[in-house]
Regions:
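Conserved, charged catalytic cores of large soluble enzymes
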Residues: 1-42, 46-48, 63, 71, ...
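Function-dense linear segments that define catalytic or interfacial modules
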Residues: 24-117, 129-133, 210-211, 215-239, ...
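Catalytic alpha/beta core of large soluble enzyme barrels
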Residues: 58-60, 99-104, 187-188, 196-356
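Internal maturation/activation junctions in enzymes
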Residues: 91-114, 118, 122, 139-201, ...
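Short cysteine-rich clusters marking metal-coordination/redox-active sites
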Residues: 379-382, 395-398
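Cys/His-rich microdomains that often coordinate metals
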Residues: 385-386, 402
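Short Cys/His-rich "knuckle" micro-motifs
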Residues: 388-392, 405
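Short Cys/His-rich micro-motifs in 6-15 aa windows
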Residues: 398-405
C-alpha cells in the first residue's frame, strides 16, 4: 500500500494499550515509554518537554542533545562478601570528572548537536556487574535484601556524582543552560544537567566478564562451542564456580547438568542456600524484575535499560500487569520479552546437538513456567553462536554485536 492509501482511524487509549500489550506478548515489541514520568524529572524544563529517547530506552534527550556514557563494574567492589562503599564513592567522583572532560574534548560535525551538548553537559554514569555483586554478597536478586542493596548502591553513586558535579561547577562554572534548569531556583551549582544513566552494557560487560547493567545473570553455565575433537566447551560463571570449589562440589559433569537445566533451581546436587543466591533471569518472577528496576530508578537521573523476562507460557494479562505495575512504581520505560516468542533466538544454555531440556521457574508467582527451546543464531563473522542480552546479540568469540530496536 502507498501512503495515500492510509486511512485515519479513531481508537481509544484503552484499545491502543491493549494492542501494545498483545504485540509485546507476541514478540517483545514495542517497548513502552512513560513520558509524563520522564518530564517530571526533566532537569532543563526551560528547553521544553522531552519527547524521545535513544533506542535502548535509558537516555531521554532534548532535540539535538547527546550524552556520553560510562559504567562502573560493581563486581570489583566486593571484598570478603562486603561492598566497599567508600571506594565506590571515590571511583564515582573520578568517573564524573572524566566524563565531564569528555564533553570538552568531543567534537561533533553538526553545530546544533555541539550546541546542545555544550549547553547541557549531560553525562551518563551507570553500572554493570550488579548481578555478580549479589552473587558475591550472597544475596538473591528476587529478595527484599536484593532490592535494598540496589537502593543503597545506586544512592551512593547518585549522591557522590551530584556532589562532584557541584564541586566542578564551583571550579569551572555551571552548565550554560543552568538558568533554564531546575537547579537555578534551588541555587544549587551544577556542572552537568544530568549525571546518571544505566545503559545495557551488553558488549562492554562481555569484555570485562561481568553481568550486564542491572540484569540478573542469564545462565550460570552454558554451551559455548566445540573444541578439538568431540569435546564440548561449557562456560561457567566464575563466581558460581568459585563458590562450588570452596564447598568441594565443582565438577565438569555438574556444570553440564546445570547447563542442560538452564538453572540450579532443580539440580539436586546444589545446596538450598546456593539456590536462593544463584538465581538466573528465568528463575525470577516478572514483578521482581519490575521492582528491581524501580529501586534503581529512584536514584537515577535519566532512565534504565532492562528487560523484564517472562516464561514462554505467560499470559497477555501478566504482561499487561507488568506494564501497569511499572507505571505505578514510577518507571520511565519498560521492555518485556516472553521466552520463545521470536522465531529465531540468540542464546542457548546447552549443546544444540542435544534435545532441549525444560527448566522450571522456582519463584512464587511463576511456578511451573518453563523456558522454551532456544534456537542458535550464528555470528556472521566467525560463525560461532550469538548470545542475547538486553535486546542485543553478542558473540563471545569475536566481539560482533547488534541490537534489535
Amino acid at each position: 500500500d502507498s501512503i495515500q492509501d492510509i486511512q485515519e482511524e479513531t481508537i481509544t487509549a484503552k484499545e491502543l494499550f491493549t494492542e501494545i500489550v498483545e504485540c509485546a506478548w507476541h514478540n517483545g515489541e514495542p517497548g513502552i515509554v512513560f513520558l509524563d514520568a520522564v518530564n517530571k524529572t526533566n532537569p532543563v524544563p526551560g528547553l521544553g518537554r522531552i519527547e524521545a529517547c535513544n533506542p535502548c530506552g535509558e537516555q531521554f534527550l532534548h532535540d539535538g542533545d547527546v550524552c556520553n556514557l560510562g559504567s562502573i563494574n560493581l563486581s570489583k567492589f566486593v571484598t570478603n562478601g562486603k561492598v566497599e562503599f567508600e571506594r565506590l564513592k571515590e571511583v564515582t567522583r573520578r568517573a564524573v570528572r572524566m566524563l565531564d572532560n569528555v564533553v570538552d574534548i568531543t567534537e561533533y560535525p553538526v553545530d546544533r548537536v555541539t550546541k546542545a551538548m555544550q549547553g547541557n553537559r549531560r553525562v551518563g554514569l551507570g553500572i554493570m556487574g550488579f548481578g555478580d555483586l549479589l552473587y558475591q554478597t550472597g544475596i538473591g536478586y528476587n529478595t527484599e535484601e536484593g532490592i535494598a542493596m540496589a537502593e543503597k548502591v545506586m544512592d551512593v553513586i547518585q549522591q557522590a556524582a551530584h556532589q562532584t558535579s557541584q564541586e566542578i561547577a564551583e571550579e569551572k562554572g555551571n552548565f550554560p543552560n543552568y538558568d533554564l534548569s531546575v537547579y537555578k531556583p534551588q541555587k544549587v551549582p551544577m556542572r552537568n544537567a544530568a549525571l546518571t544513566t544505566v545503559a545495557p552494557t551488553g558488549t562492554i560487560s562481555m569484555m570485562y566478564d561481568c553481568s550486564s547493567g542491572i540484569e540478573p545473570v542469564f545462565a550460570l553455565s552454558y554451551y559455548k562451542g566445540q573444541i578439538i575433537g568431540s569435546n564440548t566447551l561449557y562456560y561457567t560463571n566464575p563466581i558460581f564456580e568459585n563458590a562450588l570449589r570452596e564447598r568441594g562440589l565443582f565438577s565438569e559433569e555438574l556444570m553440564k547438568k546445570v547447563a542442560e537445566h538452564g538453572s540450579v533451581a532443580h539440580v539436586d546436587e546444589i545446596p538450598e542456600d546456593m539456590k536462593k543466591t544463584f538465581v538466573v533471569a528465568h528463575d525470577i518472577a516478572p514483578i521482581w524484575h519490575v521492582r528491581m528496576q524501580a529501586a534503581f530508578q529512584r536514584h537515577v537521573d535519566n532512565s534504565i535499560s532492562k528487560t523484564i523476562n517472562f516464561p514462554h507460557d505467560a499470559s497477555v494479562e501478566e504482561v499487561k500487569q507488568a506494564y501497569i505495575s511499572a507505571y505505578q512504581m514510577g518507571l520511565k520505560g519498560l521492555t518485556v520479552y516472553r521466552d520463545g516468542s521470536r522465531q529465531v533466538e540468540v542464546l542457548t544454555v546447552q549443546d544444540p546437538t542435544k534435545k532441549s531440556v525444560t527448566a522450571e521457574n522456582n519463584s512464587t508467582n511463576a511456578q511451573n513456567k518453563g523456558m522454551a527451546t532456544q534456537q542458535v543464531h550464528e555470528c556472521p563473522n566467525c560463525k560461532k553462536e550469538l548470545r542475547m542480552q538486553e535486546g542485543c546479540a553478542l558473540c563471545a568469540d569475536c566481539g560482533y554485536s547488534y541490537c534489535s530496536l
